[in-house]
Amino acid sequence: VGSFSRFRPTPANFAIFASPNRAHQFLDDIHEYVVQHQSTNAFVLGSFARFTSGFLGFFMCGIVGYIGAQAAAPIILNGLRRLEYRGYDSAGICTVSVGGIEIRKRAGKVADLESTLHVSAMEGTSGIGHTRWATHGVPNNPNAHPHADASGTIALVHNGIIENYLTIKKKLVKAGYAFASETDSEVLAVFIGMLFEQTGSLEQAVRTALVEVDGTFGLVVVSSQEPDVMIGARRGSPLVLGIGNNEFIFASDASAIIAHTRQVVYLHDNEMAIVHRNGTYVTKTIGNEATESAIEEIEFELDAIEKGGFDHFMLKEIFEQPNTFRDGMRGRLQIEDGNVRLGGLSAVGDALRAAQRIIITACGTSWHAALVGEYLIETLARIPVEVEYASEFRYRNPIILPHDVVIAISQSGETADTLAAIREAKMKGATVIGMVNVVGSTIARETDAGVYLHAGPEIGVASTKAFTSQLCVLTQFALLLGRMRGLGQSEGRALAKELDAIPMKIQNILDRVEDIENIAHEYSSASNFLYLGRGVNFPVALEGALKLKEISYIHAEGYPAAEMKH
């Protein structure tokens, strides 16, 4: 314990987590302390690295990279605007031209890049951009991305956590390198620059650096010494490559790509893509083995990521729920047969019939949906179900039996803790099913089978339509499993009819928007809310409380109604 007790969980220390920036600084302070005392705190250091990878992974930065024949800066700027919903505290752009690389960045909003730094006028037909939410170092101009190497000829943007950055930084400082920021990302840029000096190859320098790195990354690298090349790589942080007409766009989210192309490659973990201005590209592992990544097509339309006349994305998505719920049933729900067709599960049909236990793992809102799924599956299929926080699942060495089926639920399909949970389950021999919204996401690729939500892009940070779509899919899954396990056709038909009526009932509620506004106004001065529910409505109470906390920052708690008397 000793002096480490200054980081004890006091009310003052917990209070700082109301501000992400202060929270990150607090975590940095702890990390610095533990590294300085790692000989006596080796266990704490390892635990802290795992904790920060999960906690800080919640704050998603945005990446855009472009190489082609058009002016890069306006394309990158528009891409960053598409990623603003992810949350950030600073932004920046780097372009590559005959004069070298030019970086303009600052703390603040993407709009500030244009209003104060005039980034759209930056020259060059290739470049990278970034929106940052601080993980190492406070939000200020030097800590903003992109970061350059010591020579000023290489630049990168990076999402993720470099867990061993202090070790690498000490070696670089000893070799005479200096740093302008407090970030782990600049350490990686300088490291790549040093390796480029040794190898003369940007690809080789990036690959060698990433082999040495512990942690997670989604990154894009450019160099004025190889101006016709751009390199992207990922491990634990999503990165998508858009393929246009003799042009390429890297992004952390397909929403930044769709305005330019619908053809994309979703990079896998420990995979890199090397793209060239002449329109050619290759993908390979970080270990330099060739890979064959399939070209896929973005399914959603551009207007799906526009506000469509609403003041907020969240409000738009709330009003989309009648349609998104219906889309989750389309082609699946067989009302007269009282059954469901889920083609994505055909490969695991035998495993579902033989299943003796189902484990559902998820985080946040998806965990609340999983609790509803527990009620439904046990009621309709009479199979025992356990619901696990993905963030806790792998750390307790879970017992997985031969006929267990694990279901992973995630809107994005990229939730780091849920990914770690499914990898643990697969390692222990479980059949793993994914229920995700984003086509081509990592969870969709790594599970044995799965079901898409078909909710369309969810831009709002607080989940709405994805939650109801998860309930839609879970209900159909429970019905399918029930019919496999002896549930009668008449019972199935009755449930299917009720499920089919839900979109209309959602619409009826949304039509009462004035009543809802009046209720909100009446209770707007309250400082505490208690959401109560029993049975299947207890998870709904948890979700309701979470929504109020997320959006209003008013304290709210979901609680089992029957427990009030205790």
Stretches found by the model and what they are:
Residues 66-69, 158, 178, 195-199, ...:
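Hydrophobic alpha-helical scaffolding
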